[in-house]
Amino acid sequence: NPAVVNYTTAVFNFRKPFFLFTFVAMSQKWIYKPEPDEEIVDGLISSIGFGTLESKILVLREIDNYQKAREFFKPNGTDIHNPFLMADMQKAVERIATAIENGEKILVYGDYDVDGTTAVALMYLYLSKIVDKKYLDFYIPDRNVEGYGISDEGIHFAKDNGFSLIIALDCGIKSVDKIDLANSVGVDFIICDHHLPGDKLPKAVAVLDPKRKDCRYPYKELSGCGVGFKLCQGLNTIYKIPESELFELTDLLAISIASDIVAMTGENRVLAKQGLKFLRKTRKFGLRLLIPEEKLAHFEISNIVFDIAPKINAAGRISHAKASVELMISDNLKQAHQIVNEIVNLNDERREMDINITQSALNQVLELEKVERYSTIVYDPSWNKGVIGIVASRLIENYYKPTLVFTEGNNGEMVASARSVADFDIHKALEFCSDLFMKFGGHQAAAGLSMEKDKFEEFKVRFEEYVKMNIQEHQKEPSIYIDSVVKPEDLNREFFNFHRKLAPFGPHNMKPVLVLKNVKVNGYVRLMGKENTHLKFNILQPTTGRNIECVGFRFGQFAEDFKAKTFDLAFTIEENHWKGNVSHFLNIRDVKFHN
């Protein structure tokens, strides 16, 4: 789905980037979504009372009748499905109940990214309400020592410390050999994952994953933390903590949904919306300290992506993600302050590392681009494993090709993060080469792998050949999908109110991209940023005589063109909150100048 990649771009464009180097301004292909059926639009206008523009935007999202509109704007809980529809849920609940009854020690285990650490925090906090903490602990693998997923070290930690049950979150679906090891030493596993399964499922007590072929759970796009939340719901049919306390944990789930860029539809959208409400009034000290006080009342998905996720991720990227979990579960304000200071410093270190490695990778790509290629593959053994995924995304912003960034692992193997373009399935491309890997996993848009060094040259040839044979024309250049052409007078209070109701935004429920044609700047063009990288200007709203502010991040190089020419403007709408007042501005996504 192109929305996945476009979402990343839209979020990144929303704020000033911190890079010292300059990205090439890449032109985008404008794809106008087909005009929806007039009869359906008219039917929606008469049934829900929105205007023509608003109704068109809804129909383009397949919200094409009163019932769907009601479910979208006022969900009644039917989208939060029965957890026992998920394969193995009953087994998982019964095994945990047995462990609690018998006084067994339970270890909550998770990946080191935001989805994994929020999942561990959520599960730990739920279990701590029903289990004495002396029977409970959590474990996050060290990215630099153990790598991704379930590790030998984690299993031996459990065995050596008397844990007979591990609940694994956001990992484990392909850990067949590791679960066999755990079984051989008497440690049971419950797996809660959302990644694509392999041909063979691990022999765990229970494997919860809505993407299992034999799973009849109706919603397939849960995050790893989301699968963990479903297990908590299942457990709560026995332990019955107040529902308000259970759903208070959705503040962590909202962070997971936003950070892992899963679909913002159905159950995810309902849970994200619920989670944002709890996040704005969260009682978790660590989260309160991460959120600027002035933003708290209006905290949205984009704020999670910018203000929380990078900091939570920084611990796992640069040091150890255990700090992120401790931050989210801490009930000690002094401890929470100390951890926040630590991860803010780690995030600053991560930013500096990101800048340097991205520049180094860009230098490599300049050499690679001398020969026509359909993919980008770069390698340097000195690059930090924790930031190569970010670097891959940066390279795509410049060169827009399926991209892998390799570095060296702890045991001399090569490890990589892969990122894709548009709807090109990079997981499938890697599957084509999987006989070369030690292990790999991921999604359509992003994946990771490890590989012996002597396989690298063959991999580059085979991956390039696969991309060349399978990539489609529309996947070779960045595209912007436009909902509607509008006039300045359409951008009024009623439309802004409607726009707010569409939130939370994310893949499959993107902010509408609109186009104004034949626009002229009204007054000045002001450059912004230390390097004059960004700009802002006004256009006139003729019916009110007021100006509408337009902001262009990384459009500073076009300041003279904006001053002198008419242009077509593709944009999304953003909100500013300041001292109780709300204003709106147009966030420029692309521009076409008229000669």
Regions found by a protein language model. Give the residues of each.
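Histidine/acidic-residue-rich, glycine-tolerant segments that coordinate divalent metal ions
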Residues: L169-L222
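Short alpha-helices
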Residues: L122, K200-I241, L246-A258
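Hydrophobic helix-and-loop "lid/oligomerization" segment in the mid-to-C-terminal part
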Residues: S27, P34-L165, V185-G186, N236-E458, ...
